[in-house]
Design a protein with these regions (language model features):
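Feature captures hydrophobic
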Residues: 2-147
Length: 147
């Protein structure tokens, strides 16, 4: 970090080193915060594809699950979790599907509610192999999906 001319990299490396040695508490910077308004105002595809960068590869080992997300007005997106990566798709030929309103999905991603609460309230339905879908969604660094 001390030898690179790139200020952003240097600052990131120094802040990370200080966090690791205990002289700086940077845990709040390592928490992903998803804003409900951003999910609701953006395209449907981004409401699902945002998860691709939140996958924890070690938790996704051995998973090969394709999930379609069906939202109101026939809007659809998909995510295929395989080889420890999440690949956005259009949802066609998915073996599992999740159906809910976009607002419910935004609540789950933003932490206002959890996946299990949405299922219990019957505002979200999973078709196909529920256990595989839940295990795949548990691989993401989103508190609302780990329930």
């Amino acid at each position: 970090a001390q030898r690179t001319p790139a200020a952003n990299i240097r600052n990131w490396c120094l802040a990370r080193a200080r966090h690791l040695d205990g002289s700086l508490d940077a845990t709040r910077f390592n928490t992903h915060r998803i804003n409900k308004r951003q999910i609701l105002s953006g395209p449907i595809s981004s409401a699902v594809s945002i998860l691709r960068v939140l996958l924890e590869p070690t938790r996704a080992e051995g998973i090969d699950t394709h999930i379609a997300f069906n939202f109101s007005q026939g809007q659809k997106a998909g995510l295929h979790i395989r080889n420890c990566v999440a690949v956005p798709t259009d949802g066609s030929s998915a073996t599992n599907s999740i159906s809910c309103e976009l607002a419910v999905w935004a609540d789950i991603l933003s932490g206002s509610t959890t996946l299990s609460q949405a299922i219990a309230a019957s505002v979200l339905q999973i078709d196909g192999n529920t256990a595989h879908a839940l295990r795949a969604l548990d691989c993401f660094d989103v508190a609302g999906l780990r329930s």
